[in-house]
């Protein structure tokens, strides 16, 4: 009885949090909240890191993928699964609900120019996504679990990584920080390169190739904004060259991760297996 109740209530809780998050994000653009769109708030804190508005179209992809995750929950909890898989999916679901609350709260704080609070909230959202990613690390997932669970959160995690960097940058603008006396362009170069290094290391550590895609997309956007005549019109070449280097770093990390995955993990993996140790049903993560 308890499992049946959970199979009905838990997906509804996930779906409700998702719908509320979508509604709040829609209102942020349609009303808009506090008379400003999300992009207009960002533009009111000029800096050299913020990607152009077109890059934020990735949110449409994220919410579409998360919709697939939400629908999938109504099927996954209606079937009998092993305890480990069920527990993993429950933890992911709980973290998703919490992350949706942080997402909603961030929208409100952002639109009312509570930049410090919004920074704390988006970092909390990032932590939720980090914990979700750790739940998938070294787990053997079915194709459906990869498609409907891991993929949505990989893209979401990657984009929020960029969003945290952008939010912190805007916070520094808000408080009038002087970048330790460094020129703004040089400071932005450092942020871009450190961000690329963190994203590359995260991808390799989590063995998650899709995570890097939205980060690279944001860096492409930074390049576009800096070379576009309606943007910075090539006034800061070091910034868009740094973004290009960042993309190259992520690509090399991707190649390294692919090669590393092909290598045998342990010497004993190369030894003949005994009859009792064979598991023909094993699936690569």
Residue ranges and their predicted role:
Residues 6, 75-79, 136-140, 254-271:
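Membrane-interface capping segments at transmembrane-helix boundaries
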Residues 50-56, 180-197, 224-252:
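Membrane-interface transmembrane-helix boundary segments in multi-pass integral membrane proteins
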Residues 18-35:
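Alpha-helical transmembrane segments of multi-pass membrane proteins
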Residues 2-14, 59, 213:
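N-terminal membrane topogenic signal
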Residues 105-119, 175-182, 203-206, 229-234:
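Membrane-interface helix caps and helix-loop-helix hairpins in membrane proteins
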Residues 43-58, 147-154, 177-187:
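Short aromatic-rich membrane-water interface segments that cap or initiate transmembrane helices
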Residues 210-222:
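Central hydrophobic cores of alpha-helical transmembrane segments
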Residues 16-23, 91, 95-106, 122-134, ...:
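Alpha-helical transmembrane segments of multi-pass integral membrane proteins
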């Amino acid at each position: 009885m308890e499992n049946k109740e959970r199979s009905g209530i838990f997906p509804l809780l996930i779906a409700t949090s998702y719908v509320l998050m979508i509604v709040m994000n829609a209102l942020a653009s349609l009303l808009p909240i506090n008379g400003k769109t999300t992009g207009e708030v960002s533009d009111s804190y000029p800096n050299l890191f913020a990607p152009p508005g077109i890059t934020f179209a990735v949110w449409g992809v994220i919410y579409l993928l998360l919709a697939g995750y939400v629908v999938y929950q109504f099927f996954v909890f209606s079937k009998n699964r092993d305890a480990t898989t069920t527990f993993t999916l429950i933890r992911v679901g709980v973290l998703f609900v919490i992350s949706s609350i942080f997402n909603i709260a961030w929208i409100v704080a952002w639109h009312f120019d509570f930049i410090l609070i919004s920074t704390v909230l988006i970092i909390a959202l990032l932590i939720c996504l980090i914990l979700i990613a750790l739940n998938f690390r070294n787990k053997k997932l079915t194709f459906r679990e990869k498609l409907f669970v891991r993929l949505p959160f990989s893209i979401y995690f990657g984009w929020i990584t960029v969003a945290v960097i952008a939010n912190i940058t805007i916070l520094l603008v808000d408080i009038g920080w002087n970048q330790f006396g460094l020129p703004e362009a040089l400071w932005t170069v450092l942020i871009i390169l450190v961000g690329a290094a963190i994203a590359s290391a995260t991808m390799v550590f989590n063995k998650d190739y899709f995570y890097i895609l939205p980060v690279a997309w944001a860096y492409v956007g930074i390049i576009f904004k800096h070379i576009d005549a309606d943007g910075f019109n090539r006034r800061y070449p070091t910034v868009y060259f740094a973004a290009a280097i960042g993309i190259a770093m992520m690509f090399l990390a991707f190649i390294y991760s692919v090669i590393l995955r092909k290598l045998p993990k342990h010497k004993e993996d190369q030894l003949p297996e005994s009859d009792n140790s064979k598991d023909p049903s094993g699936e690569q993560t």
